[in-house]
From Swiss-Prot:
Receptor for the A1 pheromone, a prenylated mating factor. The gene is PRA2. One of its GO terms (molecular function) is mating-type a-factor pheromone receptor activity. It comes from Mycosarcoma maydis (Corn smut fungus). CDD domains: 7tmD_STE3. This is Pheromone receptor 2.
Length: 346
């Protein structure tokens, strides 16, 4: 557990998973599926951050860049919440389409929905960043083989500031999921016509792929969050939050944690959670990275890459086969040039 080879494998897999999670981003960019694009953003950011941490701190506690570690800790504590909020954006849009509220939407309505999506998918995770300092007792944890993380003061305020936000967003997602199913049951015979009448660009198959993706992401993140809450309560329980000054005493200290000093049960929990964090990227790729539309995009990119490489090779070949006139002049050589004149008769 947490061996050098495992860390390298996990780090490389995180980087690959982060990349494949964005494989269909062009399709959703054209369709303006902001919720899915935000999912890809958070998934890519979180997994690349995990991969870099696993590789940089592999059997090491050397901290080369403290500010970068601060940024890494912020990403680590917000990216999964960002996934939950992005799933909520997707379900909000699907419920609006199914309820036919978007049938006569104006330009202002579309702009307002765009602002709401960015406010939920980016604003809520960003809002939690300054609030987290209330329950952050010191600056950083640097854990061998894992990397940078922000410490959490396990207390009643921590439940409301950190844990319950995720559970609350998951609950709202569940409500929207029930509403989507309700509208589908009411209009299942005219559902395809309802989708086309709103110019949503969604077929019934794509609509339910989006629905399944949002539910899957919400369930995966919520399951991980429940596991974290249960583990934190079992290990240390809730500490009394007496005052700001006492909780934040010597705030600038950085705690370096060798992996040998961590209990086996805690190591097992950390190992389960970090491998489980790869599942959102797998869900994104399975639902939208293997479709016919995505495959056509891959083929177009591959052809463009081949054409680019062949054009560069042709330019280099043309340059090698061109006449060196300076060499002819230096040797006093003579050569003739045949110029063909074409006559055009109108």
């Amino acid at each position: 557990m947490f061996s050098g080879k495992e860390n390298v494998s996990f780090g490389v897999l995180c980087l690959l998973a982060g990349c494949i999670s964005t494989s269909s981003c062009l399709i959703h960019l054209q369709a303006k599926n902001i919720g899915v694009l935000l999912m890809m953003f958070w998934c890519f950011t979180g997994l690349v951050n995990k991969g870099i941490n696993a590789l940089a701190f592999n059997n090491s506690l050397r901290l080369a860049w403290t500010l970068g570690c601060d940024l890494s800790a912020i990403i680590e504590r917000t990216w999964q919440f960002g996934l939950c909020c992005s799933a909520l954006c997707v379900l909000q849009r699907l419920e609006g389409i199914a309820s036919l509220r978007q049938a006569h939407s104006t330009v202002w309505d579309r702009k307002r929905r765009l602002l709401i999506d960015f406010g939920v998918g980016l604003g809520l995770p960003a809002l939690q960043i300054p609030m987290f300092f209330i329950v952050q007792p010191y600056r950083l944890n640097v854990i061998e083989n894992i990397g940078c993380s922000a410490p959490l003061y396990a207390s009643v305020p921590a439940l409301f500031i950190y844990h319950l936000w995720r559970l609350l967003v998951s609950l709202v997602c569940a409500v929207y999921a029930v509403l989507v199913l309700r509208w589908f049951m009411l209009r299942r015979r005219q559902f395809t016509a309802a989708l086309s009448s709103q110019h949503s660009g969604l077929s019934q198959k794509k609509y339910f792929r989006l629905f399944a993706l949002a539910i899957c992401e919400r369930v995966l993140v919520s399951a991980g969050q429940f596991y974290v809450i249960i583990q934190s309560l079992q290990i240390g329980g809730l500490l009394p939050y007496t005052s700001w000054a006492e909780v934040h005493t010597n705030f600038n200290r950085i705690l370096f944690v060798p992996v040998d000093t961590i209990a086996h049960s805690s190591l097992l929990s950390l190992s389960i959670l970090r491998w489980f964090s790869l599942t959102p990227a797998m869900a994104l790729f399975v639902f939208f990275g293997l479709t016919e539309e995505a495959q056509s995009v891959y083929k177009a990119r591959w052809k463009a890459l081949i054409n680019l490489c062949s054009s560069k090779g042709k330019k280099q070949t043309d340059g090698r086969e061109s006449l060196d006139l300076e060499a002819f002049e230096s040797h006093g050589s003579k050569f003739s040039v045949l110029v063909q004149r074409d006559t055009v008769i109108c």
